[in-house]
Structures are given as structure tokens and as C-alpha cells.
Regions:
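Short acidic-glycine-tyrosine-enriched beta hairpin
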Residues: 247-257, 262-265, 335, 369-390
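Transition-metal
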Residues: 1-215, 288, 293-306, 332-334
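C-terminal, non-catalytic macromolecule-binding modules
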Residues: 270-322
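Short beta-strand segments in beta-sandwich/barrel cores
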Residues: 255, 356, 363-368
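Acidic, glycine-rich loop-and-beta core segments that form the ion-binding/anion-interacting portion
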Residues: 208-277
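Conserved short histidine dyad/triad with adjacent acidic residue
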Residues: 316-319, 331-352, 377-378, 386-387
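A short hydrophobic beta-strand segment most commonly corresponding to one strand
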Residues: 94, 135-141, 269-288, 330, ...
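A short beta-loop-beta micro-motif enriched in histidine and acidic residues
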Residues: 31-33, 80-81, 91, 130, ...
């Protein structure tokens, strides 16, 4: 068991304060810090702290896969850690995006390999052959767009904006089943000629301004989001797509689960992500990065969903609030130690015998495993190899630990 130092990724939409403050580094950071990767993804592996220096977690897995991963995980996933943990800090909206299914990822990866597109190329869609289901748990209030809203609710929103240019698209939704109508409308907007997009976006923004100015409340969040996106990405078809997606606000501790094909865009906030160990992203707009609309359309799931269905259900299990996700690659829980447990050695068994990544989000604790102990304060992480478990915790103050393990 060792302390784990994450790899920081800097993107323009990140925060100069959130990750730096969380990990106890000087604020503000020199650049916007968007993600802190805690895992063994080849793109940015985390580092194990040793008395004589640091070793990448990726190297440690290659050197001792049996001890690090355990026989059960190796039998299912080979010598690869199947999950990746991230701290995500968004001061600005992220791209409109979705992730492929396992079958789509395998096919897409092979196709791009045959085309000779380098894995590091900015126009590469499939950097690996894995799907990328993901869970996001809010550390602070978190805002997102996710999943196609049921058509009836979208029709109400479009009518509330009172934009005559939207009338033909309301008819398009009305005349078909939900999934077919949403597919037809999204495809029409995302593939429209730029002059048509410019006219429609301008009309929608005018309607959103009028709606907000009227003091109406039912769709105030949706209208304000469209205005924000329109200001940041003028003339982007993603501004129109935002009208079709559920607008979600998460309180700390609440989570959303995004399966393959779920169209989403994170707007702002600080959260914890755990996902299958993949970097496959198909983008459709709201970004200066590579956009591949035909490939995005190929992977999207147009079946409508509700905010309640996107929220990750939870249940209590021992110390943990477990987030129920139907994914073999990962499972996640928030472990909580309160005043009555301070100073006591408390068992924190895991459902599985595989490895664990622990991230302290509040307080401080000693983690006790077979190979020794580590001290965790807020923002610090630990790697618990398969042969280090089960673990025990000794909290020195009220403490919360985010734990990621395999799901199986």
C-alpha cells in the first residue's frame, strides 16, 4: 500500500484554484487545471511514492500483476487496471460528447488502426478498444447536461421560448416516436449548413433572452444555459442540441451514471469520476477539439431518459454509501467515519479481492493494510494492491474517503 500522486491535466475549461486547493498546492495554479488522473492509463499514469523515489502505477502493474491486481481481476481483464479515477474541475462548459459501447470501441479502434491514424493524433476518435461508462459524483454543486429529455418535455420548452423558427422542429418531434423524433431533430440540427445554424441560434438566443427577462421560472435554467453556451460558442450547433438534453444540478454526494451513447456536456463544478479505463470520446460541438459528427451519430442512444433515471442509485453498506452501477470494470463508494469512530480501528472490507484506490475528500485518517500504513489527509490518495487488503481505517477527525474498486 502506497501513497498515489495523480497526474494533472490542463485544459482551458479547468480551474486555477479547485484542484490545487484540494491537493494542498499553491493557489492559483499557473494554468487552468481540469483533471487529476488516478490510475494506470498509459496516457497519464499516476505515481506510487516510495522511500527511494516514485514509480508509475503502470510500471508496478507490469512488474507484479498478480500481487497488484489479484487473480480474479487478471482472469477477467488481463494485466490491466480496468478502472480510472479522476478529480474533475470545470470552470467552463466541456464539449458535447458521448462514449462508445464495447463493441463500437473495438470496431472503431481496429478501423483507425488499419487507416494508420496515430493514437496520439488529435483527429483520432478511438485511442483504445474499450468502452467508457462513467460515474460522476459531485464534490461541490455540479451542473451538467445529460441524456435526451422525453420529447413531450422538450416540446414544452421549445414552445415556451416562443420562437417561430422552432415551429417546424416541434412538428418533427410531434409526428414521430420519441427516439425517432429526437434522432431526426438532433441530426437535422447537428448537420445543418452553417448559415442555417447561425439564423436559428440567433433566434433561439433572442427567445431565451425574452424568456429570462419575463421572470418565468419553469425553464429558466435551460434558457440561461443556452445563453451561456451561445456566448461562449457562437454559431455552434451544440447550442441547439442543449435544448434537447436534461439539465441536471447535483448536490455534493449525488452522482450520475452515463452509459454508452449518452450525449452529455458538463457545465461547471467539481466532481469525482470513476470510469472504465478508456480515453475514447466522440465530440459533436462546444469545443475547439476534433469533432466527428457522423461517428457521434453512429454511437448515440436516442432513447429518452429522465433526470431521475440518470441519477446513480445508492445503498448503504457498512461505512459506505455505495453507488449502484451496472459495470464490471468499477464500483464506487463514499466511506464516512464520524465522531463516534475517531481513534478506533474500523474494518473497511471491500466486496472484491482486487485493488482499491482511496481518495480522502474530507478529514484525515490512517489506512492500515497487510503491508503497512499510509496517512491520508484531504486531497491525498492511496493505492491498495490486491495483496494488501482487506484494510482498516483510523480516523483522526470526521473523514470521508472515496473508494474505487472493480465491479465484477
Amino acid at each position: 500500500m502506497q501513497l498515489l500522486r495523480g497526474a494533472v491535466r490542463t485544459y482551458a475549461w479547468g480551474s486555477r484554484t479547485a484542484i490545487a486547493e484540494f491537493t494542498g498546492r499553491p493557489v492559483p495554479a499557473a494554468h487552468p487545471e481540469a483533471e487529476l488522473w488516478l490510475g494506470a492509463n498509459p496516457g497519464d499514469p499516476a505515481w506510487l511514492e516510495n522511500p527511494d523515489g516514485e514509480t508509475s502505477l503502470l510500471q508496478a502493474l507490469l512488474a507484479d500483476p498478480e500481487g497488484q491486481l489479484g487473480p480474479v481481476v487478471r482472469a477477467r481483464f488481463g494485466d490491466v487496471l480496468p478502472f480510472l479515477v479522476k478529480v474533475l474541475a470545470a470552470d467552463e462548459p466541456l464539449s458535447l460528447q458521448a462514449h462508445p459501447s464495447a463493441e463500437q470501441a473495438a470496431e472503431g479502434y481496429l478501423r483507425e488502426e488499419r487507416l494508420g491514424i496515430p493514437v496520439t493524433s488529435p483527429v483520432r476518435n478511438y485511442r483504445d478498444a474499450s468502452h467508457k461508462p462513467e460515474l460522476l459524483v459531485a464534490l461541490q454543486q455540479f451542473e451538467a447536461l445529460a441524456g435526451f429529455r422525453p420529447a413531450a418535455a422538450t416540446i414544452e420548452l421549445l414552445r415556451a421560448l416562443a420562437v417561430s423558427d422552432l415551429d417546424p422542429f416541434i412538428d418533427l418531434l410531434n409526428d414521430q416516436s420519441d427516439a425517432d423524433g429526437l434522432r431526426a431533430l438532433f441530426t437535422t440540427w447537428i448537420t445543418a449548413p452553417q448559415p442555417d445554424i447561425d439564423v436559428l441560434v440567433s433566434a433561439v438566443l433572442d427567445g431565451a433572452i425574452q424568456y429570462v427577462s419575463s421572470g418565468a421560472t419553469e425553464f429558466a435554467s435551460e434558457a440561461k444555459t443556452v445563453l451561456e453556451l451561445g456566448e461562449r460558442y457562437p454559431g455552434d450547433a451544440g447550442v441547439l442540441a442543449a435544448l434537447l438534453l436534461n439539465r441536471i444540478t447535483l448536490s455534493p454526494g449525488e452522482g450520475i451514471y452515463l452509459s454508452a451513447g449518452n450525449l452529455h456536456a458538463y457545465l461547471r463544478g467539481v466532481g469525482l469520476e470513476v470510469m472504465a479505463n478508456s480515453d475514447n470520446v466522440l465530440r459533436g460541438g462546444l469545443t475547439p477539439k476534433h469533432v466527428d459528427v457522423p461517428e457521434l451519430l453512429r454511437v448515440l442512444n436516442f432513447n429518452p431518459t429522465t433526470v431521475a433515471e440518470i441519477h446513480a442509485p445508492t445503498h448503504l453498506d457498512g461505512l459506505g454509501l455505495v453507488y449502484d452501477t451496472p459495470t464490471a470494470e468499477f464500483s464506487a463508494a463514499m466511506l464516512t467515519l464520524g465522531d463516534d469512530q475517531l481513534g478506533h480501528e474500523v474494518d473497511a472490507p471491500s466486496r472484491h479481492e482486487g485493488p482499491q484506490i482511496l481518495l480522502c475528500t474530507e478529514g484525515s485518517t490512517t489506512v492500515v493494510g497487510k503491508s503497512g500504513t499510509v496517512q491520508l489527509a484531504r486531497g491525498a490518495a492511496a493505492w491498495v494492491a490486491a495483496d494488501d487488503g482487506p484494510i482498516r481505517l483510523i480516523a483522526h477527525e470526521p473523514t470521508k474517503i472515496f473508494r474505487a474498486t472493480v465491479g465484477l
